[in-house]
Amino acid sequence: MNIIFYHPFFNAEEWLAGLSQRLPQAQVRAWQPGDDRPADYALVWRPPHEMLANRGRLKGVFALGAGVDAILEQERAYPGTLPAGVPLLRLEDTGMAQQMQEYALSYVLRYFRRFDEYQLLQQQQEWRPLDPHQQDNFTIGILGAGVLGKSVAQKLTAFGFNVRCWSRSPKQIDGVQSFAGAEQRAAFLDGVQLLINLLPNTPETAGILNQQLFAHLAPGAYLINLARGAHLVEDDLLQALEQGQLAAATLDVFVTEPLPQAHPFWRHPRVTITPHIAAITLPQAAMDQIAANILALEAGQTPAGVVDVLLGY
């Protein structure tokens, strides 16, 4: 069994050693340009087109993250990047759900307790208590009800918040009001005071966080984008903040990463930036899951995390 690995930022030595330990029957190597030797499985993140092209004998392509949009974007730009008929698999949880819960809860509480406003008041040396928000009339909406969206919804519900979610198809989450489909999106947004985006990045969801959507939220709402930068129309966010339609935004993802130094988000007093760290891939847990899925494929079983390429997740 031959496995090729490519990630521009991960420690390749750590991954090769970890995978070899878990799959001693496998020959694991870091892919380099010009490497066209046989491979049964590919572990990738934003792979160059030539890495997977003409590898029709692959048994599986593993995305080294929860999202597969980078691979599918490559396929749209360079057809053949993803060999036809080869299953594409993504990581499911591997510690990401807990990280996402922690991140979302931290910033929900920051806005709910108005700590962001107190920080601005401190900079102005102004001592002024603010009226607190009340959970009874502080509705949180979550776009996306997959593994991460569901996990965040459950955490916030357990904290006593009124939570609703929206997804492409109906989902059932205990204690959470569910909306589905384009026909229910406006009803989902109505009255939401804090919106969290955890949608998959697909052509259908690109640019969904725009002025039209913001107008449906409660005046002075908050936005937390934890999915992909492509979901957000950045100029529309700046306009919504300027007009007071949105009170503040926390952004972990951006159209261009790293965020250019001249970007206005850096200096905006009501925009909080983190460098795409809301839920990072934990190597040991990820290797455990990938190894288990490879063994499942070798045994003719259905592995976890198989992606519907047409849907994009």
From Swiss-Prot:
Its EC number is 1.1.1.79, 1.1.1.81. It comes from the Bacteria. One of its GO terms (cellular component) is cytoplasm. It catalyses: glycolate + NADP(+) = glyoxylate + NADPH + H(+); (R)-glycerate + NAD(+) = 3-hydroxypyruvate + NADH + H(+); (R)-glycerate + NADP(+) = 3-hydroxypyruvate + NADPH + H(+). It holds the Pfam family 2-Hacid_dh_C. Keywords: Cytoplasm, NAD, NADP, Oxidoreductase. One of its GO terms (molecular function) is hydroxypyruvate reductase (NADH) activity. It is found in: Cytoplasm. It is an enzyme of class 1 (oxidoreductase). Its main location: cytoplasm. CDD domains: GDH_like_2. The active site is at R228, H276. Catalyzes the NADPH-dependent reduction of glyoxylate and hydroxypyruvate into glycolate and glycerate, respectively. Belongs to the D-isomer specific 2-hydroxyacid dehydrogenase family. GhrA subfamily. This is Glyoxylate/hydroxypyruvate reductase A. The gene is ghrA.
